[in-house]
Amino acid sequence: MNDTRTSRSARFDTTPVVVEDLGLIDYHAAWELQRTIAAERAEGAGSDRLLLLEHPSVYTAGRRTEDADLPIDGSPVVQVDRGGKITWHGPGQLVGYPIVRLAEPVDVVDYVRRLEEALISVCTELGLTVGRVEGRSGVWLPATETLAERKIAAIGIRVQRGVALHGISFNCNSALDGFQAIVPCGIQDAGVTTLTRELGREVTVAEVKPMVATAVVQALNGDLPVRDHDLPRPGTTPAAPNSTRVRSMT
């Protein structure tokens, strides 16, 4: 992949990122808080923040969501201004919203890759082999003889007036029932999984939260370089180590 910016910070400011643990919080309340912080950052006020939290069960639909993607059981959906399609949030899933004024010139793809890198590093530390799938954002486990590729972390962002909003969702020990009524992120040929399911032990949000906080801040500050973690896909040749590639983003 084309890695031209990871030796320096993705952030405009050099002041420390303020990490806040909001616990379990309603989606609308968290969204309003995001917008308030983002407006301050666009004016050069306040500090970059990383909000870490869980939501009560809720579906959110990004700008590319189509009618066919909506829940088959008629569950209500919150329409939001991030990229991507529909997803589910709920207890047992760690959500992170970095509200960050980005360095200029703004590079959205680079920013997303840094968030992916942070989550990949956490999975690796926990003992999971994960990576990226060409043309799809997020963090994935490779396909096996019996299982399709499985997404363990999703990313959906918006950049407005040079400030990033929304962010990451990382499945720790969440129930997967919420995903059954939708096609998560509009991807029909892959699955969804959790850390608990893949590691064969209970992995809680509380265990993972400090790891994610550290990794995200390191990635945004340029202390965690973005590396090539492309997963081999059926019918493709795995990329050579340290190879570079320009990626598309969905």
From Swiss-Prot:
Residue ranges of domain BPL/LPL catalytic in the record: 44-224
Biased segments, Polar residues type: 239-250
Function: Catalyzes the transfer of endogenously produced octanoic acid from octanoyl-acyl-carrier-protein onto the lipoyl domains of lipoate-dependent enzymes. Lipoyl-ACP can also act as a substrate although octanoyl-ACP is likely to be the physiological substrate.
Recorded family membership: Belongs to the LipB family.
GO-annotated biological processes: protein modification process
Keyword vocabulary terms for this entry: Acyltransferase, Cytoplasm, Transferase
Region feature (Disordered): 224-250
Amino-acid positions noted as binding substrate in the UniProt annotation, renumbered to this chain: 82-89, 154-156, 167-169
GO cellular component terms, A-Z: cytoplasm
E.C. no: 2.3.1.181
Site (Lowers pKa of active site Cys): 151
Cross-referenced PROSITE patterns: BPL_LPL_CATALYTIC, LIPB
UniProt GO MF annotations: lipoyl(octanoyl) transferase activity
Listed name of the protein: Octanoyltransferase
Note: In the reaction, the free carboxyl group of octanoic acid is attached via an amide linkage to the epsilon-amino group of a specific lysine residue of lipoyl domains of lipoate-dependent enzymes.
Active site (catalytic residues): 185
A Pfam family it matches: LplA-B_cat
Leading EC class: transferase
Subcellular location: Cytoplasm
